[in-house]
Swiss-Prot record:
It comes from the Archaea. Belongs to the UPF0216 family. Pfam families: DUF61. This is UPF0216 protein MTH_949. Transmembrane segments: none annotated. The lineage of its organism: Archaea, Methanobacteriati, Methanobacteriota, Methanomada group, Methanobacteria.
């Protein structure tokens, strides 16, 4: 009984940590057409993207990839692991290039020092997403 209550509280806290995440992500192509590129978080806050980051990102991708890449790129932090996961073939391509690693397909695992490098280059293009596995 006690475990059920603490599990529910943990899930609620994780939900609260993720309230900043957008209810709808936009493609890089869409954002480049906006005067003030942004997405709206589920909590109603606006997350603005810096032009320099969007242009830097655009230079790394083909036209087709710019049409398909949805932003922000999520850095998935899980409760049971020490690193983070980034999913999606285009997202992995970007992260691999920034970190000077081989492209690993459709997901990549990174650790704290690599997160700092990624966030230093793309602070507005990336966002943390907190996950908790079934307890």
């Amino acid at each position: 009984m006690r475990g059920d209550r603490s599990d529910r509280l943990m899930k609620k806290e994780i939900f609260n940590l993720n309230r900043h995440l957008p209810s709808r992500r936009k493609t890089l192509e869409e954002l480049l057409r906006e005067d003030r590129p942004h997405v709206t978080g589920a909590d109603g806050t606006r997350h603005r993207f810096k032009w320099a980051e969007l242009e830097d990102l655009r230079g790394m991708l083909t036209e087709d990839e710019a049409r398909r890449l949805r932003l922000p790129i999520y850095i998935e932090i899980e409760s049971e692991t020490s690193g983070a996961r980034i999913a999606g073939d285009i997202e992995v391509k970007v992260v691999s290039e920034v970190l000077e690693r081989d492209d690993e397909g459709d997901e990549i695992y990174i650790y704290r020092p690599e997160m700092r490098v990624l966030r230093a280059r793309f602070p507005t293009v990336t966002q943390y997403m907190f996950l908790v596995r079934e307890l």
